[in-house]
From Swiss-Prot:
Keyword annotations of the record: Carbohydrate metabolism, Glycosyltransferase, Transferase
Residue numbers annotated as active site: 365, 394
Primary role: Maltosyltransferase that uses maltose 1-phosphate (M1P) as the sugar donor to elongate linear or branched alpha-(1->4)-glucans. Is involved in a branched alpha-glucan biosynthetic pathway from trehalose, together with TreS, Mak and GlgB.
Organism: Picrophilus torridus (strain ATCC 700027 / DSM 9790 / JCM 10055 / NBRC 100828 / KAW 2/3)
Top-level taxon: Archaea
Residues the record marks as site: Transition state stabilizer: 452
Protein name from the UniProt record: Alpha-1,4-glucan:maltose-1-phosphate maltosyltransferase
InterPro entries named in the record: GlgE, GLGE_C, GlgE_dom_N/S, Glyco_hydro_13_cat_dom, Glyco_hydro_b, Glycoside_hydrolase_SF, Ig-like_fold
Name of the top EC class for this enzyme: transferase
C-alpha cells in the first residue's frame, strides 16, 4: 500500500513497457500528479541516470492541482532510466502552517522549536557545502527574533536544502521507466536519396557531394550497394522479361560474388566506400545505408542455408509475395524458422559489420514484414553497444504497426505524408503525430517522393513540388527527397503511383542543371531549418484561416517563433486572414510585432491576432515568418 499517490506520469509509454525517446542535449520534462490524504504537503523528486551509472535527483516543482514537473538533459546518447519518488514534506508543511498561524495571530513558539528540530535533523544527514550552509542558518535562527526567524525559515534556497535532507516519511517509489537519448541526426536531418549506379561509382559520388551540399542536405541516403541477383532479374519498368543490359533491382540482393557483406563491384571496393564516408563527413554529410533483409535466388544464403527460407509444397523456395503481385527476383527470409536464432544473429551481424566500417544510419526496407520481437531484440542489442547508431523504418503499412515498430526500437519512421494533400488531411494527421504519447516515441520522416511513390499531386507541376517541399521541411524535423524531385520529374507509369522508366530497374543519367528546377528553393528551406531551432524541435500549432486553400501553422520553442503560411493551390492567387497564436507565443493579444519572411526575405509589421496574407503561385507560394516583438 502506497501512502503517497503518484499518478498520470508522463511520458510513460504503455505502462513503462517501452522507452520514451529524446534527442541528446534536449531537455526532457517529466510530469506527474502527486498527492496524499489530509493536509500534509508532498515532496516529489525526479530520479534519473544513464544506465548503470549513479542516480541523480532533482526536486519537482508544483504547477497547481497536485501536478508536479521536473527536467533533466541527457548529455550523451544511450539508455537512461528515470522514476519519481515522493514522501511527506514535513518541513514544507510546517512552514506553511507557521505562516498561516502568524497571519491569524496564533502563538507559534512551539512550532518554531519543531522547525529548528527538523533543521537539526537535516543537518545530521547533510554533507559538504550543504552542511556548512545549514550550520550558518541554524546559528542565525537560534539567535534571531521572531521576524528574522520567519524570514530565514521562508528562504527558498535554505528550504530546498532542508527538504533534500529531511526524513523521508512515507516514501513511495514509482516504477522505473526508460528513455532513449539518440544522437542529433536521429531527430534532425535533411535527406537526399540517390541510386549510386546512376551517378557512376563511389568515386563519382564523392564528386557529386558538392551537388548534394549545394542544396544544404546533411544526409545522403544510398539505395542498396550489394551485388544484384541474375536469376529472374526484372527488366524495364519491373517487367518479368529482361535482357543482358538490364541492371536489375538493387533490392534483389546477392549473386555469386557475395551478399549483404559484399559491395557491387561496379560501384567500387570497400575501401572506396569508406573513402566516401570520410569525404562526406568532411562536408558535414552523413551516409545512410539501405538494409533489405531479403535475398535474390542467387544469394549465398540460398545455397548455404536453405532452411532460412519459406518452402512451397513441392520443395521449391517461395518467392516474395504481396497479392496480387509476386516478385520472382526476391526470396523472403523466414524469421520463424526452426533454428531462428542462427538467422537472427546472422542478420544482426550484417548491421554490426557495416557499423564496424563506419555506418551510423540505416534505412531498413519493409521492416513490417519481419517479426516485431526480432526488431526489438536486434535494435536494443545493437544500441546497447552502439548508442550512436540510428534506424529508419521504411514501413508503409497499417498505422498501428508503424507505431509499434517505433516502440520496438526504430529511431524514426516513414509516414502517410505523401497521401495527405488537403488542409484538413494535413491538419488532422499532424495533430495526431504531435499529440501524446506519439510525440514521445514516433519521429516522422517526411519524404516528398520515393522510388516507389510518385504522388498523384505532383502531376500538377513545379508549384506543387514547391508546396510539398515547404510542407515536408517545416512540418517535421526529418524530411527528404528522392533524386529528381528537385528537377520536378513527374513522368508517371500509366495510372499508377510508379515512375515511368523507374530507376529501380535501370540506370538513369540526369541533367542536374535542367530548367524548371527548384534547387535554390530547397537549398533555402534547408538553410532556414539549420538556422531556426523551432523547426528542429519546436511545438506545432495549426492556425485558423478563413480560406481552406491556405494552411497556416506555428512552430515555436523558447528560442524562436516561426509561422508557416502556404497556398495549397498551384494555379490561383489565394488570400485571407490568419489567426496568429499570440497566446502560445506568450505575446499580448494587442501586440505590434515584427515579421520577417525568411523564405522571400520580406519584412512586415503586424498587430494583433488576425492578419492578412496574399499568396501568388510561382512567385510567393508560401511565407516562412520569424515573429519577434517590435
Amino acid at each position: 500500500m502506497d501512502p503517497v499517490a503518484i499518478e498520470n506520469v508522463t511520458p510513460e509509454i504503455e505502462c513503462g513497457r517501452f522507452p520514451a525517446k529524446i534527442v541528446v542535449n534536449s531537455k526532457f520534462t517529466v510530469t506527474a500528479e502527486v498527492f496524499r490524504a489530509g493536509h500534509d504537503l508532498v515532496y516529489p523528486v525526479l530520479m534519473y541516470r544513464k544506465l548503470k551509472k549513479r542516480w541523480r535527483s532533482v526536486a519537482m516543482k508544483g504547477t497547481g492541482n497536485d501536478l508536479y514537473e521536473a527536467s533533466f538533459t541527457p548529455d550523451e546518447p544511450g539508455i537512461y532510466e528515470y522514476k519519481i519518488s515522493a514522501w511527506k514534506d514535513s518541513y514544507g508543511t510546517l512552514i506553511r502552517n507557521i505562516n498561516a498561524w502568524l497571519g491569524s495571530n496564533e502563538d507559534v513558539e512551539q512550532d518554531l522549536i519543531e522547525a529548528i528540530n527538523l533543521i537539526k535533523d537535516a543537518y545530521k544527514r547533510s554533507s559538504g557545502n550543504d552542511k556548512k550552509i545549514i550550520k550558518r542558518y541554524l546559528d542565525d535562527l537560534i539567535n534571531s527574533d521572531l521576524n528574522k526567524k520567519v524570514m530565514i525559515l521562508n528562504d527558498n534556497n535554505f528550504s530546498s536544502i532542508i527538504k533534500k535532507y529531511q526524513k523521508k516519511i512515507d516514501k513511495t517509489d514509482y516504477r522505473t521507466l526508460r528513455l532513449i537519448a539518440d544522437p542529433e541526426y536521429g531527430g534532425y536531418g535533411s535527406w537526399y536519396e540517390l541510386f549510386p549506379r546512376s551517378i557512376g561509382n563511389f568515386n563519382d559520388i564523392i564528386k557529386h557531394l558538392n551537388y548534394v551540399k549545394s542544396m544544404n542536405f546533411n544526409v545522403l541516403y544510398l539505395t542498396p550497394i550489394h551485388p544484384i541477383g541474375i536469376t529472374n532479374r526484372r527488366g524495364k519498368n519491373g517487367s518479368r522479361i529482361s535482357d543482358k543490359n538490364d541492371p536489375g533491382s538493387p533490392w534483389a540482393i546477392g549473386n555469386d560474388s557475395g551478399g549483404h557483406y559484399s559491395i557491387n563491384s561496379d560501384l567500387g571496393s570497400l575501401e572506396d566506400f569508406k573513402n566516401l564516408l570520410r569525404s562526406a563527413r568532411e562536408k558535414n554529410i552523413m551516409i545512410a545505408m539501405d538494409i533489405a533483409l531479403q535475398c535474390s535466388p542467387d544469394h549465398p544464403y540460398v545455397r548455404d542455408h536453405p532452411e532460412w527460407f519459406y518452402h512451397r509444397p513441392d520443395g521449391s523456395i517461395r518467392y516474395a509475395e504481396n497479392p496480387p503481385k509476386k516478385y520472382y527476383d526476391i526470396y523472403p527470409l523466414n524469421f520463424e524458422t526452426k533454428n531462428k536464432m542462427a538467422l537472427w544473429n546472422e542478420m544482426k551481424n550484417i548491421f554490426l559489420y557495416w557499423i564496424s566500417n563506419g555506418v551510423k544510419i540505416f534505412r531498413v526496407d519493409n521492416p513490417h514484414t519481419k517479426p516485431l520481437d526480432f526488431w526489438e531484440w536486434l535494435i536494443n542489442d545493437i544500441k546497447r553497444d552502439h548508442p550512436d547508431v540510428v534506424f529508419l523504418s521504411e514501413a508503409f503499412t497499417r498505422e498501428n504497426l508503424m507505431f509499434e515498430l517505433s516502440k520496438r526500437g526504430f529511431t524514426m519512421s516513414y509516414t502517410y505524408f505523401t497521401w495527405k494533400l488537403t488542409k484538413g488531411e494535413i491538419t488532422e494527421y499532424f495533430k495526431k503525430l504531435y499529440s501524446y504519447p506519439y510525440n514521445f516515441f514516433f519521429r516522422p520522416m517526411l519524404f516528398t517522393n520515393t522510388p516507389d511513390i510518385l504522388g498523384r499531386d505532383l502531376s500538377m507541376g513545379r508549384n506543387e513540388f514547391i508546396i510539398r517541399s515547404v510542407l515536408a521541411s517545416t512540418l517535421s524535423s526529418l524530411w527528404g527527397i528522392y533524386s529528381g524531385f528537385e528537377l520536378c520529374e513527374n513522368d508517371r507509369l500509366d495510372d499508377t503511383e510508379e515512375y515511368l522508366n523507374s530507376e529501380k530497374y535501370e540506370i538513369k543519367r540526369r541533367n542536374f542543371n535542367s530548367d524548371n528546377n527548384i534547387k535554390d528553393i530547397i537549398a533555402r528551406l534547408n538553410s532556414i531549418r539549420d538556422e531556426m531551432p523551432a523547426l528542429r524541435s519546436g511545438k506545432i500549432k495549426f492556425c485558423e484561416t478563413d480560406n481552406d486553400k491556405i494552411i497556416a501553422y506555428a512552430r515555436y520553442n523558447n528560442e524562436n517563433k516561426i509561422l508557416v503560411v502556404l497556398n495549397l493551390d498551384t494555379m490561383n492567387v489565394q488570400s485571407g486572414f490568419i489567426r496568429v497564436p499570440l497566446n502560445d507565443f506568450s505575446m499580448d493579444l494587442n501586440s505590434i510585432y515584427d515579421v520577417h519572411d525568411v523564405l522571400n526575405n520580406n519584412h512586415y509589421k503586424w498587430s494583433g491576432e488576425y492578419n492578412y496574407v496574399r499568396l501568388i503561385p510561382g512567385k510567393r507560394q508560401a511565407h516562412i515568418m520569424v515573429i519577434k516583438n517590435a
